[in-house]
């Protein structure tokens, strides 16, 4: 997370970009946006953190055990097509007009490219990235989205983000699971974004 944010910040600054009108990040991308906003090196006018992952607030040994749990869970999905389809049913997670068999063939092949080291790094960084004690004051208008079907899983993230960013608004998206809105319903996603950004049709 920290490395990605540093690289993005450097790139923006090298290209003369000193502020952003809007920013969006989902899941791990939401973790990156949380870190980006906290540092405040490049002010953002409006930000949407969609089911963003926040740092664990527990002892190191428990964080290591949680990382091990996530690692093995993800590893099972990468090794078993049946587990992949049970966790993410093709009838729900295939875009209209796409062949679910071809889509999941490609997804399964892609997941196998992840090394054990990469998987561990992803989960450790997503849940243990550093934040300053208090975020930079930039006047950003921000909102945290989550799918209502993942509300229990996001509970600790919501609790943390509300405490860390007091101005953060929270919005549950009906009938949606993790990252489902942006991945499966682009028109609805645009509608929600326009509503937040106060853009007219």
Where do the PLM segments sit?
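Active-site loop/oxyanion-hole signature of alpha/beta-hydrolase fold enzymes
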Residues: 1-24, 187
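Conserved serine/cysteine hydrolase catalytic core
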Residues: 117-163
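Short, hydrophobic alpha-helix immediately C-terminal to the catalytic nucleophile
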Residues: 34-38, 190
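Catalytic histidine-centered segment of alpha/beta-hydrolase-like enzymes
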Residues: 176-187
């Amino acid at each position: 997370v920290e490395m990605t944010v540093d690289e993005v910040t450097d790139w923006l600054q090298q290209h003369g970009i000193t502020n952003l009108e809007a920013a969006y990040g989902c899941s791990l991308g939401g973790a990156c946006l949380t870190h980006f906003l906290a540092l405040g090196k490049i002010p953002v006018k409006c930000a949407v953190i969609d089911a963003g992952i926040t740092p664990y607030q527990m002892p190191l040994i428990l964080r290591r055990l949680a990382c091990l749990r996530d690692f093995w869970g993800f590893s099972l999905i990468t090794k078993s097509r049946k587990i992949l389809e049970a966790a993410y049913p093709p009838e729900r997670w295939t875009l209209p007009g796409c062949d679910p068999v071809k889509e999941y063939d490609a997804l399964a092949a892609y997941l196998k490219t992840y090394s054990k080291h990469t998987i561990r790094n992803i989960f450790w960084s997503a849940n243990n990235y550093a934040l300053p004690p208090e975020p930079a004051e930039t006047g950003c208008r921000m909102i945290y989205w989550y799918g209502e079907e993942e509300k229990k899983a996001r509970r600790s993230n919501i609790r943390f983000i509300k405490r860390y960013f007091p101005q953060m608004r929270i919005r549950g998206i009906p009938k949606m699971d993790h990252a489902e809105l942006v991945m499966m319903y682009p028109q609805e996603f645009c509608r929600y974004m326009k509503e937040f950004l106060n853009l007219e049709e």
